[in-house]
From Swiss-Prot:
Matches recorded under CDD domains: ABC_MutS1 (cd03284)
One GO CC term on file: cytosol
Assigned keywords, A-Z: ATP-binding, DNA damage, DNA repair, DNA-binding, Nucleotide-binding
Function: This protein is involved in the repair of mismatches in DNA. It is possible that it carries out the mismatch recognition step. This protein has a weak ATPase activity.
GO biological process assignments: mismatch repair
GO molecular function, one term: damaged DNA binding
Keyword ATP-binding appears in the UniProt entry: yes
Pfam families in alphabetical order: MutS_I (PF01624), MutS_II (PF05188), MutS_III (PF05192), MutS_IV (PF05190), MutS_V (PF00488)
Cited InterPro entries: DNA_mismatch_repair_MutS, DNA_mismatch_repair_MutS-lik_N, DNA_mismatch_repair_MutS/MSH, DNA_mismatch_repair_MutS_C, DNA_mismatch_repair_MutS_clamp, DNA_mismatch_repair_MutS_core, DNA_mismatch_repair_MutS_N, DNA_mismatch_repair_MutS_sf
Gene: mutS
Name listed for the protein in its UniProt record: DNA mismatch repair protein MutS
Length: 868
C-alpha cells in the first residue's frame, strides 16, 4: 500500500534531519509522526493518536497548536532535544496538490533566539572545539541571541585541559565536538562536570582552507590575515559558523565581529575553584542565591547582569585596568546624584543586545521594536549624566557613547504605540507616517461606520431589536438573527450560516460593502507588514552601532551595580599592587554577612606575602570558622581584581594569577572516585599548575585514608607548596601536630580559630588568631548536632583515654619536620610495653629520613597488634 503524498513528503524531510524532532506544519497545528510522535507525547505529556497514511496501520501522531508552539518547543529544548521547524512555504488557497514545505530553522539548546526560552542575565553559549596534530587546541564561542563570536587558542602540554577549564567557566548550553575529541579522557570529564550541556558530535568536518573562506565571507578578509597561521582557531570557528548557518538557514547579519581573547590575560580559575568559591552557582542547589554574584548584582538591565557575571568569572590581572575600574566605581560611590540619574534611566532600558540581534535576524515583532524605541529614548539622559565625569573609564565611555538619535527618530515616526504580537494583524504603523496606509485605514474606518449604520437601519426596518452585524474569517460579514425572530426576516435576506440558536444572513448591499472593506483591510495589513519589514531592515543596518552602545551601557550598569553594593554594604576601595602582599584588616565574607545580616559577622585580619609569611597553617575545631575564613580571603582577592570594593576596613591586594580552592570533598559517583581520590585529583591540579603568584586555599587535606597517611600527605603538600612553588597559601587542617612545622619552615606561620571554654560549654569565637589549636572539640560539635547523651558521655571517656596514649606516642621526626605519629583517634602504645618505649627513646632521629621514620612506626604498629 502506497504512502499518501503528504506522508511521503514528511518522510523525505525527516530523512534530512534525522537527529531532530520534526514539527511538521499542517494548517493550524504542528504535527509529529512515528517515533517523533511517541517521544514528544511522552516528554510533552500530550495525547498520542494515529493517522491514516496509506499504510496497513495508522501511524502514531501527536500535535500542538502553532500559536502555542513556543512553550512546547521550549520544554523539548530544556530537555536537550533539537527541534526542526517545517513550515508551509506556499499558500494552500492557491496551490494545487500538496503544499510545498521546508525546514526553515533547526532550534537547538545552543541556538536559541526567542526571549521566552532564554535566561535574561545569562549568555546562551554555543562552543566548538578542535585539536590539531601538534596538540594545539582551538575554541570558538558564540551567543546567537546577542551576536557574540569569540575565539581562543591553547598551546602546549596542558592545552586541552586548559581549554576544558574555559568550557567549565562558560557553562555552554551546547558543545560541538569532532569524533576524535568525543572519546578523549578530558572531554569525558567535561561531560560529568556539565550534565545540562548537550554535546553534539559532528559526523564530518571540512578542510581548514574551506573554513577560512567561510569565515572571510562572514567577517571579511581580516580572518585570513589574522588567523591564517592558527589552524586550530580557524577549524573551531569554521565548525561553529557552519553549524549556525546549517541550523538557522539564513544570513547571520548580527554576527559582525570575530574577536580573539586569551584566558591567560585574566585570573585563572579552574572548575574546582569556581564551584568551591560559589562565584555564580551555589553548592547547595546550583542557584544564584548564596553566591558572590547574588551579592554584587544590582544591575538594572539584562545585558549589564551578563557583563557583571563575566567580570566575576574573568577577574583582571593587569593593575592599570583594575585601577581604571576602581576609579570609576569610586567616582560613582562618591556621587549619589550621578548614580541615581544613571540608574533611573537604566531601569527603563530593555535588552538592546538581544533586541538588535532579533531585528537583524528578522524575528523582531512590533513589541520588540517598541521596546527598542523606548530604550533608545533613554540614551540621551545617560549621555548627559556622564558629561561631567572625571575618571578615565567613565570619560572614555562618554566619548564613545552613541545615542543613535537618527534611528530613534525613524522608529518614533513610524511605529504605532501598541502594536499586536503578530505582524499579520495590522496596527503596526503610526497614523501620518505613510499616505497610502492612512487612506486604506480611513476606508476601513468608514466601512466600520457604515456597518454600524446598516445595523441600526435593519433593526428599524425589520423590527428585530437584537439583530446584530458580525464577522468571522470563514463567512465574512453577516446579519445574525435569533430563532425567536426568524419569522420577521425579510425576503431579500440570504441565509449564510445556521447555528444552534440563530441564523446568519447576508444582503446584496452588505456583500458589496464587504468586498470594499475586506479589500481595504487586506491591502492595509500587507502594506503595514512591508513597511514594518523595511523599518526593521533599517535597524538591522545599524546593528553594529547598537551592539557597541549596548556594550557601553552594560559596562555602565555593572559599574553602577558595584558602586551601589559597596555603599549598601560598607565596602572599601582596595589597594591593588604587584608586590605580592595580601593584607586585609577586618575582612568579612561578602556572602555570609549578607545572609546573617550586616553587623553579625565577625571580621578577621589576614597577612600573606611571598617571603616571610607565605603559608598560613590554620588549626582549630570544626565549626570554628576555618573554611569560611579561607573562602573569605579568596573572595576578597577576587573582588579586588574584578575592580570591586571589598568587605574590609582596609585591604592591600598583591595581584594573583590563579586561585585554587580545594575545600571539602565527597565521593564522585559519576566517575566512580572515592572522597580520597577526589582530594588527590584536586591536589594534583594545584601541584601541576600553581605558580609563585598564585593563591592556594586547602581545607582539611588527608581525609578518606588513615590518619597516619593523611597527615603524611598533608605535610608533604605543605612542604612542596612552601619550598618548591612559593605561592601564598591558606592551609587548614585537623592534624594539630603539623603546627610544629612553624619553626622549621621559614615562611610558615600558625593561626587558629579562637575558642572560649565556659565549664562544659564551648563558644566558637570565629576569630582567627596567631596561635595553634590544642583541641578539636569534636565531642562538643556532636552535642550541638543533637547526638544522644549516652554517646556524648562515652565519647568523652574515650577521648581522655586516647589523649593519654597520644602523649605517650609523640616523637620527633628527622630533619626539618616535626610530627606526631599517633592521632587523637588511634592508641598505638600502652605504658606496660617497656621494650617499645626503649626502642623509641634509643632512636637516632638526626640520621633518619621521614620515610625511614614512617616505616619504623609502621613496623611498631604491626608488632603491637601481634601483642594484643
Amino acid at each position: 500500500m502506497a504512502l499518501t503524498p503528504m506522508m511521503q513528503q514528511y518522510l523525505d524531510i525527516k530523512k534530512q534531519h534525522p537527529n531532530t524532532i520534526l514539527f511538521f506544519r499542517l494548517g493550524d497545528f504542528y504535527e509529529m509522526f512515528f517515533e517523533d510522535a511517541k517521544l514528544a507525547s511522552q516528554e510533552l505529556e500530550i495525547t498520542l493518536t494515529g493517522r491514516d497514511a496509506g499504510e496497513p496501520e495508522r501511524v502514531p501522531m501527536c500535535g500542538v497548536p502553532f500559536h502555542a508552539a513556543d512553550s512546547y518547543i521550549s520544554k523539548l529544548i530544556e530537555k536537550g532535544y533539537k527541534v526542526a521547524i517545517c513550515e508551509q512555504v506556499e499558500d494552500p488557497k492557491v496551490t494545487k496538490g500538496i503544499v510545498k514545505r521546508e525546514v526553515i530553522r533547526v532550534i537547538t539548546p545552543g541556538t536559541l533566539m526567542d526571549g521566552s526560552m532564554l535566561s535574561e542575565k545569562d549568555n546562551n553559549y554555543l562552543v566548538a572545539i578542535s585539536q590539531t596534530s601538534s596538540n594545539n587546541c582551538g575554541m570558538a564561542v558564540a551567543d546567537l541571541s546577542t551576536g557574540l563570536f569569540q575565539v581562543t587558542e591553547m598551546e602546549g602540554h596542558w592545552s586541552l585541559e586548559s581549554l576544558l577549564d574555559e568550557i567549565l567557566r562558560l557553562t555552554p548550553r551546547e558543545v560541538l565536538l569532532t569524533p576524535d575529541l568525543k572519546k578523549h579522557e578530558k572531554t569525558v570529564q567535561a561531560f560529568n562536570f556539565l550534565p545540562s550541556t548537550v554535546f553534539t558530535t559532528l559526523e564530518e568536518t571540512q578542510q581548514v582552507s574551506d573554513y577560512i573562506e567561510l569565515l572571510n565571507n562572514q567577517f571579511g578578509q581580516k580572518v585570513s590575515a589574522v588567523y591564517k597561521d592558527r589552524p586550530a582557531v580557524c577549524m573551531a570557528a569554521g565548525i561553529l559558523l557552519q553549524y549556525l548557518i546549517n541550523t538557522q538557514k539564513r544570513q547571520l547579519n548580527h554576527i559582525t565581529e570575530i574577536t580573539a581573547y586569551s584566558p591567560r590575560a585574566y585570573m585563572m580559575l579552574d572548575g574546582i575553584a569556581r564551584r568551591n568559591l560559589e562565584i555564580s552557582k551555589s553548592l547547595r542547589d546550583g542557584d544564584k542565591r548564596g553566591t558572590l554574584l547574588w551579592v554584587l548584582d544590582a544591575t538594572k538591565t539584562a545585558m549589564g547582569g551578563r557583563m557583571l557575571k563575566n567580570w566575576l568569572e574573568q577577574p583582571l590581572i593587569d593593575t592599570l585596568k583594575i585601577q581604571e575600574r576602581l576609579d570609576a566605581v569610586e567616582e560613582l560611590v562618591n556621587s549619589i546624584l550621578l548614580r541615581e540619574e544613571i540608574s533611573g534611566a537604566l531601569k527603563q532600558i530593555y535588552d538592546l543586545e538581544r533586541l538588535a540581534a532579533r531585528a537583524a535576524y528578522g524575528s523582531a515583532n512590533g513589541r520588540d521594536m517598541i521596546a527598542l524605541r523606548g530604550s533608545l529614548e533613554k540614551l540621551p539622559f545617560i549621555h548627559d549624566a556622564l558629561a561631567a565625569v572625571s575618571s578615565t573609564r567613565l570619560k572614555r565611555i562618554y566619548t564613545e557613547f552613541n545615542t543613535l538619535s537618527d534611528l530613534r527618530k525613524v522608529l518614533d515616526l513610524a511605529l504605532a504605540e501598541n502594536p499586536p504580537v503578530s505582524l499579520r494583524d495590522g496596527g503596526l504603523i503610526k497614523d501620518g507616517f505613510d499616505q497610502e496606509v492612512d487612506q486604506l485605514r480611513n476606508a476601513a474606518r468608514d466601512g466600520k461606520t457604515w456597518l454600524a449604520g446598516l445595523e441600526a437601519r435593519e433593526k428599524e426596518n425589520t423590527g428585530i431589536k437584537n439583530l446584530k452585524v458580525g464577522f468571522n474569517k470563514v463567512f465574512g460579514y453577516y446579519l445574525e438573527v435569533t430563532r425567536a425572530n426568524l419569522s420577521m426576516v425579510p425576503e431579500y435576506y440570504q441565509r449564510r450560516q445556521t447555528l444552534a440558536n440563530a441564523e446568519r444572513f447576508i444582503t446584496p448591499e452588505l456583500k458589496e460593502y464587504e468586498s470594499m472593506i475586506l479589500g481595504a483591510e487586506d491591502r492595509l495589513v500587507e502594506l503595514e507588514y512591508n513597511l514594518f519589514v523595511a523599518i526593521r531592515a533599517k535597524v538591522a543596518a545599524e546593528v553594529s552601532s547598537i551592539q557597541k552602545t549596548a556594550a557601553l551601557l552594560s559596562e555602565i550598569d555593572a559599574l553602577v551595580s558595584l558602586a551601589e553594593v559597596a555603599v549598601r554594604n560598607g565596602f572599601v576601595r582596595p589597594e591593588v599592587t604587584d608586590n605580592g602582599i595580601i593584607e586585609i584588616k577586618d575582612g568579612r565574607h561578602p556572602v555570609v554577612e549578607n545572609t546573617q545580616g550586616l553587623g553579625g559577622f565577625v571580621p578577621n585580619d589576614t597577612y600573606l606575602d611571598i617571603k616571610e609569611e607565605r603559608l598560613c597553617l590554620i588549626t582549630g575545631p570544626n565549626m570554628g570558622g576555618k573554611s569560611t575564613y579561607q573562602r573569605q580571603v579568596a573572595l576578597i582577592v577576587l573582588m579586588a581584581q574584578v575592580g570591586s570594593f571589598v568587605p574590609a576596613q582596609r585591604a592591600r591586594i598583591g595581584i594573583v594569577d590563579r586561585i585554587f580552592a580545594r575545600v571539602g570533598a565527597s565521593d564522585d559517583l559519576t566517575s566512580g572516585q572515592s572522597t580520597f581520590m577526589v582530594e588527590m585529583y584536586e591536589t594534583k591540579q594545584i601541584i601541576d599548575h600553581a605558580t609563585a603568584k598564585s593563591l592556594v586555599i586547602i581545607d582539611e587535606l588527608g581525609r578518606g585514608t588513615s590518619n597516619l597517611e593523611g597527615m603524611a600527605i598533608a605535610q608533604s603538600v605543605i612542604e612542596f607548596l612552601h619550598d618548591e612553588v612559593g605561592c601564598r597559601t591558606l592551609f587548614s587542617t585537623h592534624y594539630h601536630e603539623l603546627a610544629e612545622l612553624e619553626g622549621l619552615l621559614r615562611g610558615l606561620k600558625n593561626y587558629a580559630t579562637a575558642v572560649k571554654e565556659q565549664g562544659d560549654e564551648v563558644v566558637f569565637l570565629r576569630k582567627v588568631v596567631r596561635s595553634k589549636a590544642s583541641k578539636s572539640y569534636g565531642v562538643h560539635c556532636a552535642r550541638l548536632a543533637g547526638l544522644p547523651t549516652s554517646i556524648i558521655r562515652r565519647a568523652s571517656e574515650l577521648v581522655m583515654q586516647l589523649e593519654f596514649h597520644q602523649r605517650a606516642a609523640q616523637e620527633v621526626v628527622a630533619g626539618k619536620t616535626q610530627i606526631a605519629a599517633a592521632s587523637e583517634q588511634l592508641a598505638m602504645f600502652t605504658p606496660q610495653e617497656d621494650q617499645v618505649k626503649e626502642e623509641i627513646l634509643a632512636l637516632n632521629l638526626t640520621n633518619m629520613t621521614p620515610l625511614e621514620s614512617l616505616n619504623f612506626l609502621d613496623n611498631l604498629q604491626k608488632r603491637l597488634r601481634e601483642m594484643q
